[in-house]
Curated annotation (Swiss-Prot):
Organism: Amoebophilus asiaticus (strain 5a2)
Complexes and interactors: A double ring-shaped homohexamer of HslV is capped on each side by a ring-shaped HslU homohexamer. The assembly of the HslU/HslV complex is dependent on binding of ATP.
Catalytic activity: ATP-dependent cleavage of peptide bonds with broad specificity
Top class in the EC scheme: hydrolase
Listed EC numbers: 3.4.25.2
A GO BP annotation: proteolysis involved in protein catabolic process
Regulation acting on activity, per entry: Allosterically activated by HslU binding.
Keywords: Allosteric enzyme, Cytoplasm, Hydrolase, Metal-binding, Protease, Sodium, Threonine protease
Keyword Aminoacyl-tRNA synthetase applies: no
Phylogenetic placement of the source organism: Bacteria, Pseudomonadati, Bacteroidota, Cytophagia, Cytophagales
A molecular function (GO) term: metal ion binding
Protein name in UniProt: ATP-dependent protease subunit HslV
Amino acid sequence: MLKIKSTTVIAVMHNNEVAIGADGQATMGSTVVKGNVNKIRKLLDGKVLTGFAGSTADAFTLLDRFDEKLQRYFGHMKRSAIELAKDWRTDRYLRRLEAMLIAVNKEELLLISGTGDVIEPDNGIVTIGSGSLYAESAAIALKKHAPHLTAEEIVRESLTIAADICIYTNDNLTIEKIS
């Protein structure tokens, strides 16, 4: 099973725009197995964007479940994430899944953790993966000192900085936005 724990995914809400991006590197242990993986997915006809880190098969299982919850709860992202987290914590099969998700829409950024937690950041930035602290630090600085940048530009530059520092993050980026 392909595990993409060593990756970087970031979402930024800034100036009425939301962007999410990820690098394209997949590793198994200390070996790069692919350099152009797309870790960003669109749900609800692009109204919800998601990014994942962890085991690929596990992430797709969770994305499918999250999509089902979004359909069931009429696109209410936070409610859908909480219901997914409840399932994640109580379902014996789901508890063994090794993945983390970021979900964004026009109003919200959410981190859905591997322990079934749903976290809404208060600074408009959420990151996961091995390069997440580098990307988050860059995004915090850019939001503070370059407020004229768009959310997409902040995501791009933050991922580029993370790729320069983290050996498990490359600069083959996928970025999507919601305005």
